[in-house]
Amino acid sequence: MKLFDYAPLSLAWREFLQSEFKKPYFLEIEKRYLEALKSPKTIFPKSSHLFYALNLTPPCAVKIILLGQDPYHSIYLENSQELPVAMGLSFGVNPNAPIPPSLRNIFKELHANLGVPIPCCGDLSAWAKRGMLLLNAILSVEKKQAASHQYIGWENFSDRILARLFETTSPLIVVLLGKVAQKKIALIPKNKHIIITAPHPSPLARGFLGSGVFTSIQKAYREIYRKDFDFSL
């Protein structure tokens, strides 16, 4: 079985990225991920949600990109069952999962900037459906092992996704939180897209709260689309 048998990817994205799937780097990603999936190790998010960010936001609908690093590797308990916090969206979590500190800070800054009520649920699917691509640079992780799937090569693929999107004629709003995400600035054509940077929202970093990042996103969105982005959840 092939990768897309385990991890469905929408036709729109398969057509958009079709030139990538036979390249040696992608075949190596497929091989390594499937080996990990078939091993005794538990891999997050569930394979059905590996490409969830792409499936919720077709390439023609992308207006904002919020780039994350890699999925949450933690679990939570629901009816005595261990479930992954990760759901395939950068910073977002499964609807019943506790809200992680980074996402809690995102909600605090959003409220401080735009007055959006702080949600009680960390599912960001609504943003994705409105045109915010919530893409992680690394798409999978081993349970309780942070950054454990760097070796798979996902960043080669996510870089190609970004590069293909940056080739589009419409201006995109690219939000890069933290130094790791900001390394992607080199991929972005100058004077074509709007780049917004801020510190990482983790409590271990400093400067995210008070950065005004959502004010900047909304200002850019208004300039392009003459309306506000709906941040409600």
From Swiss-Prot:
Compartments where found: Cytoplasm
Catalysed reactions, semicolon-separated: Hydrolyzes single-stranded DNA or mismatched double-stranded DNA and polynucleotides, releasing free uracil
InterPro entries for this protein: UDG_fam1 (IPR002043), Ura-DNA_Glyclase_AS (IPR018085), Uracil-DNA_glycosylase-like (IPR005122), Uracil-DNA_glycosylase-like_sf (IPR036895)
GO biological process: base-excision repair, AP site formation via deaminated base removal
E.C. designation(s): 3.2.2.27
Keyword Hydrolase included in the entry's annotation: yes
Active site per UniProt: 70
EC class: hydrolase
One Gene Ontology MF term: uracil DNA N-glycosylase activity
Record keywords: Cytoplasm, DNA damage, DNA repair, Hydrolase
GO CC, one annotated term: cytoplasm
Signal sequence residues: none
Function: Excises uracil residues from the DNA which can arise as a result of misincorporation of dUMP residues by DNA polymerase or due to deamination of cytosine.
Family: Belongs to the uracil-DNA glycosylase (UDG) superfamily. UNG family.
Protein name, entry field: Uracil-DNA glycosylase
Species this chain originates from: Helicobacter acinonychis (strain Sheeba)
Lineage: Bacteria, Pseudomonadati, Campylobacterota, Epsilonproteobacteria, Campylobacterales
